[in-house]
Amino acid sequence: MTMKHFMALLLLGSAVTLQAQETVVKGKIDGISSGKLYLIAQTGEEKFDTLGCCDFKKSKFVLKAQVNEPMVAQLIVEGYQGGFRLLAEPGVSYEALLTNDSHSYIRGGKLQDDYESYMAYADSLRNVIDGVRTRYEAHKAQNKFRSASQANDTLRRSEQHLHQFTQDFLASHDDLITAYTFQTNALMKEAGLAESKRMYESLGAGAKAT
């Protein structure tokens, strides 16, 4: 219910129909020799549209889709769960390697490349934080108070660095990336209507227009 409120607000800026352009995703699907690939996007509170689809053979594919504005989409292999996030832009070509591990990537387009670079660095910071937290818990359990205190200080600094890095990244984007991040946060927090409105009003004009 709360997510519907936020999605309704987020979709207000999408009412203007723009000229669709061809967006192309070319690449390889690791471990699957043939099948059908779809590019799907949420275009309403409970509406999902297929932007494009293609058959693939020998694990290789070329998917062409009609996209009229930047949007968050998912590449989905028929018969398999999960998908691969794509910040799709009109008229942009992408290269992709779709796998079940960390080697998977989709490259091309400013939004996609910026977001993937952000996620890669943020994930590396989270790994550091997890390691420091493990050391802190170990020192604490062994009553090594000085070492635990030092680890705790490092942990707090690392968490603050990640928070500031995220804030700086979002501040540099008044576009789909910011809107997508706020939407994701609303989902995780199950924000109420008042909080959803506050989050929406904090978006810039560019993010609201996505």
Regions found by a protein language model. Give the residues of each.
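Amphipathic alpha-helical repeat scaffolds of TPR domains
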Residues: 172-185
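Serine-centered coil/turn micro-motif
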Residues: 109, 175-176, 206-210
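Amphipathic alpha-helical coiled-coil segments
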Residues: 156-173, 191-198
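Short coil/turn linking the two alpha-helices of tandem helical-hairpin repeats
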Residues: 186-190
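Bacterial Sec-dependent N-terminal signal peptides
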Residues: 1-27
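N-proximal helix/coil linker or "cap" segments that precede and/or mark the start of modular domains
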Residues: 193-210
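A non-transmembrane, solvent-exposed segment enriched in polar/low-complexity residues
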Residues: 21-164
